[in-house]
Amino acid sequence: KKYNAKATFFVTGSHILNTKESDIVNLLKNGNEIANHNMYDIPYKNIPIKQFENDLIKTKSFLNKFSKNLPKWYRAPHASISDDMHEIIKKHNLKHVVGDVFANDTSIPDANWISAFILKNVKPGSVIIIHMPERGIREWNYLALENILKGLKEKNLEIVTLTELEQKSAK
């Protein structure tokens, strides 16, 4: 809210099962969107394609509890995707999203390095990948996000959802 930022949150089905519904509802009320990140945070490229599709559908049904008008976005866990997975994604009218700015925030526990890397590499239209901090998990991302949002504002870059980005680029 402080930076008038909106985002697309790629959510796994397993995360939905372990999150208070009110937290997801509040994300949506604040102008954010939620999108499909499949059931588990695993590299589905190594999983039978039928399980991939079943997990994709299951996650979509969980997400539909919060929004009947879900965005069409999908992001493969670990950015690992096969041709067969891509076909299934298209079959379900989803578009696979790949970010162009990722500071490996899951492995580098340094908020200043993460934010500096992102701010150095971001440009208008960039899709930044940063993982949600949680108590005890990736807590360094709280500070990284604060630094990034402040830096993006200083660069006069608007922080929008993927749907808004697509709409702006179509103009």
Where are these regions (language model features)?
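Terminal accessory/targeting
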Residues: 1-8, 25, 120-171
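Basic- and aromatic-lined ligand-binding clefts that recognize polyanionic substrates
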Residues: 65-81, 85-89
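A cross-domain feature marking catalytic cores of carbohydrate-active enzymes
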Residues: 11-13, 36-38, 76-78, 100, ...
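Acidic-and-aromatic substrate-binding clefts and catalytic sites of carbohydrate-active enzymes
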Residues: 11-19, 42-50, 75-81, 104-111, ...
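His/Asp/Glu-enriched short active-site or ligand-binding loop at hydrolase and phosphoryl-transfer sites
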Residues: 80, 86-121, 157-168
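Active-site beta->alpha N-cap acidic-glycine motif
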Residues: 1-43, 47, 51-65, 71, ...
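Conserved, mostly hydrophobic/aromatic
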Residues: 34-37, 59, 74, 96, ...
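Solvent-exposed, polar/charged alpha-helical surfaces in well-ordered, non-transmembrane soluble domains
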Residues: 25, 54-57, 61, 83, ...
